[in-house]
């Protein structure tokens, strides 16, 4: 048994979609979330920058004595996870591997589309991971640099619909039956995305698989918290705490949440 918290990081707030699934799956576990809003989006940054920024968030979580770390960010998973996993003793769980597994299991036509940040798409991480599981699957990747900032800004519905429709234009004539939401911000735009691609497409949100895999790892390594241990969820941002708190309360459906500002590199 291990009462230490689960650590979750993201470049911004998208990782809250992963955190929410983790809390639902494991209600007895405490968690610590850090969103690096001061430096988001990661998708347009260089490999070196992404690794450095992700390392800062990892070190922050290590300072909080977490027992496992979830990269609730596809870009960090695709670009930085392999490097940082070699540097720390704790296991890191990433969203790309979980999403790829779900996509390979879901597609019936063996045609999968992936939307993600520029960095995630450029890494071809989903293509590699999906085809590792089934080499016959055709994977089409589409960079969507506007969608993560759009989800963070949370504008009015007309603006969201217009930006999503324009961004997803390349998918309208693409051949696929399964769409992977290759950025943890995208589930926050799920309704707008479905309105463009159609109800007939199967949508893969890696967050569900991440929560299940984390559960499996904790069970395997006997790291579950004791059932009598107090449960606490802490939220940190490198951005502005007040706005972070407002949005986090809305997305997590919890008006008691208080977000805290932190300089992750300190």
Curated annotation (Swiss-Prot):
What are its E.C. numbers?
5.1.1.3
List the SUPFAM superfamilies hit by this protein, alphabetically.
Answer: Aspartate/glutamate racemase
> Which superkingdom?
Bacteria
> What biological process terms from GO does the record include?
cell wall organization; peptidoglycan biosynthetic process; regulation of cell shape
Enzyme class comes to: isomerase
**Keywords in UniProt for this one?**
Cell shape, Cell wall biogenesis/degradation, Isomerase, Peptidoglycan synthesis
Spell out the molecular function terms from Gene Ontology: glutamate racemase activity
Q: Which reaction does it catalyse?
A: L-glutamate = D-glutamate
Q: Which residues bind substrate?
A: 10-11, 42-43, 74-75, 184-185
Family annotation (InterPro entries)? Asp/Glu/hydantoin_racemase, Asp/Glu_race, Asp/Glu_racemase_AS_2, Glu_race
The pathway entry for this protein reads as: Cell wall biogenesis; peptidoglycan biosynthesis
Q: Which residues form the active site?
A: 73 (proton donor/acceptor), 183 (proton donor/acceptor)
| Role noted for this protein | Provides the (R)-glutamate required for cell wall biosynthesis.
What family does this belong to?
Belongs to the aspartate/glutamate racemases family.
> What is the name attached to this protein's record?
Glutamate racemase
The record lists the organism as Lactobacillus johnsonii (strain CNCM I-12250 / La1 / NCC 533)
